[in-house]
From Swiss-Prot:
Belongs to the CWC21 family. It comes from Debaryomyces hansenii (strain ATCC 36239 / CBS 767 / BCRC 21394 / JCM 1990 / NBRC 0083 / IGC 2968). This is Pre-mRNA-splicing factor CWC21. Involved in pre-mRNA splicing. May function at or prior to the first catalytic step of splicing at the catalytic center of the spliceosome. May do so by stabilizing the catalytic center or the position of the RNA substrate. Signal peptide: none annotated. Residues 72-115 form the CWF21 domain. One of its GO terms (biological process) is RNA splicing. Keywords: Coiled coil, Cytoplasm, mRNA processing, mRNA splicing, Nucleus, Spliceosome.
């Protein structure tokens, strides 16, 4: 019956079940602000503290979102540079001149950075399985937004296989089944 050393060791002989209850009457921290008659200053101070805490929460969330965007753009630029280095290595193996190599590498870099695929951030990272937690987070948010915009029919179509096909007739209309 004892929990963390609180309460009876055993309920035997005590005439009780040994159930332990928390005494919330003695806790003054949980009194609501409206019931607090200690004064206007104290209520206003508590209200301001809540507002500051909320503002701090919003600012940290915005900072995290900005950091995620910066990381994604850095990953994108890094992939572009990897492709440029691969081209440079291939051209150096073919014994091209340095000026020609620089020109071709710069053309490829400009092409990759200015392409519409890159602008939409859909590079080779999206083609393969994403190793980046930030990319998977962005995809999850986009999927969630798409689901929010779905119509009622789309939502009904997304029910599980068992529910869709076992409770419907040949025309796809729901059967009234009592369970």
């Amino acid at each position: 019956m004892s929990s963390n050393g609180i309460g009876l060791q055993t309920a035997r002989g005590s005439g009780t079940t040994g159930h332990i209850q928390k005494n919330v009457a003695s806790n003054k921290d949980h009194a609501s602000i409206k019931d607090d008659k200690s004064g206007h200053f104290r209520r206003r101070q508590l209200s301001n503290d809540r507002k500051l805490k909320y503002d701090k929460h919003i600012s940290t969330r915005n900072n995290r979102d900005e950091a995620k965007q910066e990381i994604r753009s850095h990953d994108l630029k890094r992939d572009v540079e990897v492709k440029c280095m691969e081209l440079r290595d291939a051209l150096e193996d073919e014994s091209e001149e340095e000026l020609t190599i620089e020109k071709k590498v710069n053309e490829l870099r400009d092409k990759l950075l200015n392409s519409p695929m890159t602008a939409r951030k859909q590079t080779s990272l999206d083609d393969r399985k994403s190793d980046s937690s930030h990319a998977s987070y962005e995809n999850k948010i986009n999927d969630h937004k798409d689901n929010d915009n779905a119509s009622k029919n789309d939502i009904e179509d997304s029910f599980s296989y068992k529910r869709r096909y076992t409770d419907c007739d040949e025309k796809g209309e729901r059967l009234k089944i009592r369970r």
